[in-house]
C-alpha cells in the first residue's frame, strides 16, 4: 500500500520539478521580451505622433498607426512562427529579428519625418491609395517585432505540459514591457530626447536584446552539446492522423475566436 502511494506521488513530484525548472528557464527570455515590448511601443507612440502630422487628422493617424502595427504583428507571428519550426538555431533567428527591428524601426521613424510632402503629392494624384505609403512603412518593422514571441517560444522548447506556463509568462512580460514603453515614450523620451532621440533609444534597446540573445544561444548550445539543441523526444513523437486533424480543427477555432476577441477589444 505504501509502495503504491509512493509511486503515485512520483509523477506529481516530477511535474512540480519540471514546472520549477521551466520557471527558472523563463527568467532571461521574459526579461528580453519585456525590453523588446518596451522598444516596440516606443516606436508605435512615435509613429502615431508622426502620422498625425502627415495625414493631418488625429483619429485617422491613430487608426492607421494601430491598424498597421497590429497587421505587422499578425503577419510576423504567422510568417516567422512557421519559419521557426524549420530553423536549427531559433535563438540566432530571434537575435537577428531584434537587430533588424531596431535598424528598421529607426529608419522608419526618420522616413516618416520626411514623407509629409510626398504623401500630399500622392494623395492629390492617386487619392486614398496614397495611404499605402505610411501603411507599408509602419507594417514592415512591426512584422519583425511580431515574429519575436513565436521564435523565442521555439527556442525555449518547453515540454508539452509546460507550454501554457511558458506562453503565458512570456506574453505577460511582453505586455508589461509594452505598457512601460507607452508611458516612457509619452512622459520621458519624447519630452527629453525628441522623436529621433527616442527612436534611437528604442533601437539601442533592440540591439541590447539581440546581443543578450546571442549569448543565451551560446549557453544553450553548450548545455545541449549540439548547435541546434535537439528537441526533446516528447516533442518528436508524431500523433496519429485522427488526433492531428482534431487538433488542427481546435486550433482553427481558437484562432477565429481569438481574432474576434481582438477585434472587439481594439474596437473599443
Q: What residue ranges belong to the model's regions?
A:
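Alpha-helical transmembrane segments of multi-pass membrane proteins
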Residues: 2-268
Amino acid at each position: 500500500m505504501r509502495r503504491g502511494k509512493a509511486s503515485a506521488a512520483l509523477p506529481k513530484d516530477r511535474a512540480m520539478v519540471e514546472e520549477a525548472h521551466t520557471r527558472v528557464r523563463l527568467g532571461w527570455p521574459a526579461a528580453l521580451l519585456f525590453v523588446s515590448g518596451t522598444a516596440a511601443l516606443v516606436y508605435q507612440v512615435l509613429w502615431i505622433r508622426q502620422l498625425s502630422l502627415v495625414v493631418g487628422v488625429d483619429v485617422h493617424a491613430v487608426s492607421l498607426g494601430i491598424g498597421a502595427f497590429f497587421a505587422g504583428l499578425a503577419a510576423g507571428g504567422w510568417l516567422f512562427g512557421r519559419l521557426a519550426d524549420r530553423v536549427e538555431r531559433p535563438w540566432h533567428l530571434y537575435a537577428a529579428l531584434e537587430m533588424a527591428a531596431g535598424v528598421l524601426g529607426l529608419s522608419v521613424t526618420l522616413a516618416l519625418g520626411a514623407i509629409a510632402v510626398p504623401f500630399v503629392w500622392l494623395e492629390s494624384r492617386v487619392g486614398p491609395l496614397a495611404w499605402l505609403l505610411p501603411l507599408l512603412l509602419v507594417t514592415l518593422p512591426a512584422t519583425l517585432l511580431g515574429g519575436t514571441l513565436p521564435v523565442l517560444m521555439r527556442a525555449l522548447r518547453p515540454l508539452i505540459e509546460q507550454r501554457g506556463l511558458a506562453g503565458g509568462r512570456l506574453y505577460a512580460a511582453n505586455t508589461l514591457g509594452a505598457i512601460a514603453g507607452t508611458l516612457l515614450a509619452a512622459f520621458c523620451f519624447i519630452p527629453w530626447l525628441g522623436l529621433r532621440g527616442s527612436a534611437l533609444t528604442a533601437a539601442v534597446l533592440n540591439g541590447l536584446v539581440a546581443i543578450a540573445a546571442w549569448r543565451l544561444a551560446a549557453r544553450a548550445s553548450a548545455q545541449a552539446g549540439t548547435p541546434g539543441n535537439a528537441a526533446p523526444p516528447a516533442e518528436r513523437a508524431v500523433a496519429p492522423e485522427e488526433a492531428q486533424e482534431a487538433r488542427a480543427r481546435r486550433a482553427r477555432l481558437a484562432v477565429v475566436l481569438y481574432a474576434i476577441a481582438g477585434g472587439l477589444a481594439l474596437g473599443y
